[in-house]
Regions:
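Non-catalytic interaction/Regulatory regions outside core domains
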Residues: 1-114
């Protein structure tokens, strides 16, 4: 594991979009659900999703035309909306990676190759 550079919330969203072309939109919130970056209309729904998930650190909701993924830490939550061809394991890894960068923490190890 390597130390992560610190990102601002808007840069964290830009970085996520660079990591995956499947991400259509996303938000960054603080631990209390305050929107830090991303569209306001998505922020309200994202806040409700994270709050409803209790203490879950990761969330994956599949829909007919896509999926919603979320990851959170003690300081931030990231929620992204993806197309239906998004690979769940890669999106979850990217979310954890960007969370670490956002907080200046340690990056997770890359998934093992099959």
């Amino acid at each position: 594991m390597s130390p992560a550079p610190t990102l601002t919330p808007p840069l964290a969203l830009d970085y996520l979009r660079e990591l995956s072309a499947d991400i259509r939109s996303g938000v960054v919130m603080d631990a209390k659900g305050k929107l830090l970056a991303g569209p306001k209309e998505l922020g309200e729904a994202a806040h409700d999703l994270v709050r409803a998930a209790g203490e879950a650190e990761e969330i994956h909701v599949s829909l007919a035309d896509g999926a919603v993924f979320a990851a959170r830490s003690d300081k931030h939550a990231l929620v992204v909306v993806c197309g239906r061809l998004a690979l769940p394991s890669l999106i979850r890894y990217d979310l954890r990676l960007v969370l670490a960068d956002l907080e200046g923490g340690t990056r997770p190890d890359a998934p093992a190759a099959a």
